[in-house]
A protein has these predicted regions:
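Ligand/substrate-recognition segments at binding pockets and active sites
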Residues: 1, 88, 113-186, 263
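A ligand-binding cleft/hinge motif common to bilobed small-molecule-binding domains
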Residues: 2-11, 186-191
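Aromatic- and glycine-enriched glycan-recognition loops and surfaces
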Residues: 4, 51-53, 99-100
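Aromatic-rich, solvent-exposed beta-strand/loop patch
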Residues: 8-26, 117, 127-128
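Detector for C-terminal structural segments
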Residues: 17-25, 60-96, 100-105, 141-151, ...
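A bilobed periplasmic-binding-protein/Venus flytrap-type ligand-binding module shared by bacterial periplasmic
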Residues: 23-55, 71, 260-262
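Glycine-rich, flexible loop segments associated with nucleotide phosphate handling
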Residues: 42-60, 123-130, 251-255, 285-290
Length: 299
């Protein structure tokens, strides 16, 4: 695929082919407070700022996702509000009316986060609203998303510190205590189970924020045990929001989803790729899934 920064400049003899995707990018929040605990590999667990629901809600309300698409993806993408936007197991009522800084400020104040004139940050007791927003230093798109989103959040008195690190360093030190710019997106709802079930807390890159909600676990377990796809999708959707709780923005707000990338390809003008589907996260090459439909249209 062509990187977003280059997707506007396709060679004259070629054509641009755009494949929609659920290849998302978002901010995973550490959900537990810092109580000095460590993962099996010694990585510290918890963050006293992101463990506060009001902080997570405020970040979600501050993000102008259309601007993130324009700036970080050069316009080749769409806003993201969940891990599987538009797929049958996604809860469509999760779209956030954002940016809404007035609402975000109200939530922060009600939760006890008061702005200090000295540095402009909010504090809850002695705790400043400051945390690292870590991304793999080799990924320019995630770097831009981190930097732009940090500026969007700053007027709230929240300081997200964009920090580029190697994946090895992220795993050793940051995975469970920093907010992380991650990418997911799958053709299978099983990914939702890995991302949000408490039994996968601290399991690799999936539920690295140690998210745990008993009601969400019950919905996810019911989805896997369902007798048919329709029944399963109802439970997958309920895990995101069931009217009372969920992992999504109406509930625990465990992520701040940002964008879904468009997969852009440059092909010969004579090549017809047929009806393209929806691409998952970037690993693999799903544009070839309909290879038998490809046609050469020139003599």
């Amino acid at each position: 695929a062509v990187p977003p920064a280059l997707a506007e400049n396709i060679p004259e003899q070629m054509q641009r082919v755009i494949m929609n995707s659920v290849d998302n990018r978002g901010i995973l929040f550490p959900m537990q407070p810092d109580e000095g605990e460590q993962a099996a590999n010694g990585a510290p667990i918890g963050n006293n700022v992101t463990a506060d629901l009001a902080i997570r809600q405020a970040v979600n309300l501050a993000l102008d996702r259309e601007t993130l698409v324009d700036v970080a993806l050069n316009g080749f993408g769409r806003p993201a509000f969940g891990p599987a936007d538009g797929l049958p197991w996604s809860q469509e009522g999760e779209k956030v009316a954002a940016p809404n800084l007035a609402r975000a400020n109200t939530l922060l104040k009600e939760a006890g986060w008061e702005r200090q004139e000295e540095d402009g940050l909010r504090y809850k007791g002695d705790q400043p609203a400051r945390f690292r927003l870590t991304y793999p230093s080799s990924d320019a798109t995630r770097q831009q998303l981190a930097q732009v989103s940090a500026e969007m959040v700053r007027p709230l008195g929240i300081e997200m510190q964009p920090t580029g690190r190697h994946w090895d360093e992220i795993q050793r030190e940051a995975l469970h205590q920093d907010a992380i710019v991650f990418g997911f997106g799958s053709h299978s709802p099983q990914e939702v189970f890995y991302l949000f079930h408490s039994e996968h807390a601290g399991f690799g890159f999936y539920n690295s924020g140690y998210y745990a909600n008993e009601a969400v676990d019950q919905h996810l377990d019911a989805a896997q045990a369902a007798a048919n796809t329709e029944e399963a999708n109802q439970h997958w959707q309920a895990a995101q929001w069931d009217g009372d709780t969920g992992y999504g923005v109406q509930g625990d707000t465990s992520w701040a989803w940002m964008v879904n990338l468009a997969h852009v390809y440059a092909t010969n003008r004579c090549l017809d790729l047929g009806e393209l589907g929806v691409a998952p996260h970037g690993h693999g090459w799903p544009v070839t899934a309909n290879l038998l439909e490809w046609r050469w249209t020139c003599d």
